[in-house]
Amino acid sequence: MAILIGERPAQALWRDYLELTKPKVVVLMLITSLVGMFLATRAGVPWTVLVFGNLGIALCAGGAAAVNHVVDRRIDAVMARTHKRPLADGRVSPTGALTFALVLALLGQALLLTFTNPLTAWLTLASLLGYAVIYTGFLKRATPQNIVIGGLAGAAPPLLGWTAATGHVSAEPLLLVLIIFAWTPPHFWALAIHRKEEYAKADIPMLPVTHGEHYTKVHILLYTFALLAVSLLPYVIHMSGLLYLICALGLGARFLQWAVVLYRGTRPHAAINTFKYSIWYLFLLFIALLVDHYLLLNL
């Protein structure tokens, strides 16, 4: 790799490469993948699929994130939120990051092919390319609907977990994908409002930059309503029970409250608080799905 390891402590270099994988994002993805796995079967997930399947998904996601760092390094350098990232700050070279990304992706694919099935490997590869190439390389700079169109790649983990456990696609995991797909726009647009000036400086056509904050707030509100409706569908189709319904209603009502506060502009930090809550929303919603699933099995 084009990195002079001797110039920096190995521990610092290790942390830089770990940062390239966006570990916090990958952890949230793995939670949804795990839920997809456990919801797919009543018999339990084989430990090899559970461990190596999720590791393969995580490695591929980390590889895609590293490519994102490479492509966005000039954008990251002019944004306060990202200017200290390893490539933007010059601590890791583009060649080193791309090599790292390729190694992660190949290892991830090898694990998926060995311990799960070809369908999961292909779907994971499609998700990787969708995020790293289509979204990062094109959509992000081409349209203010970048998040909406590109959100499908980031919504795939529960489907990947499901297919890893079963070897086939069915309606239930697609519904989980739909939940994340509906969650993505209000999640990212809230951050885009908070970082509007930085996105404008970086010449990224995020919705608040191209259409203004009011327009974006209206769409956040509309998507949050849609998300609340979609999140109830697992109960409607008898995929989940009463516990999940109560959690989905409570979490969704709170998300909707933040969207209304953001729309009205009555609190100075509503945008970033909406963004932060959206992360907890998705985490808790999928945990509720999982707990409810095992509660139903024991009734």
From Swiss-Prot:
Named in its record, the pathway it takes part in is: Porphyrin-containing compound metabolism; heme O biosynthesis; heme O from protoheme: step 1/1
Spell out the Gene3D superfamilies in the cross-references.
UbiA prenyltransferase
Q: What is its main location?
A: membrane
Listed InterPro entries? Protohaem_IX_farnesylTrfase, UbiA_prenyltransferase, UbiA_prenylTrfase_CS, UbiA_sf
Q: What class of enzyme is it?
A: transferase
Q: Which GO terms describe its molecular function?
A: protoheme IX farnesyltransferase activity
Record's subcellular location: Cell inner membrane
PROSITE patterns in UniProt: UBIA (PS00943)
| UniProt record, GO biological process | heme O biosynthetic process
Mind telling me which GO cellular component terms the entry cites?
plasma membrane
Q: Does the keyword Endoplasmic reticulum apply?
A: no
Q: Which domain of life is it from?
A: Bacteria
The membrane topology noted for this protein in its Swiss-Prot or TrEMBL record is:
Multi-pass membrane protein
What does the function comment of this entry state? Answer: Converts heme B (protoheme IX) to heme O by substitution of the vinyl group on carbon 2 of heme B porphyrin ring with a hydroxyethyl farnesyl side group.
Return the similarity comment. Belongs to the UbiA prenyltransferase family. Protoheme IX farnesyltransferase subfamily.
Please identify the protein, giving its name as recorded: Protoheme IX farnesyltransferase 1
Q: What is the lineage of its organism?
A: Bacteria, Pseudomonadati, Pseudomonadota, Gammaproteobacteria, Pseudomonadales
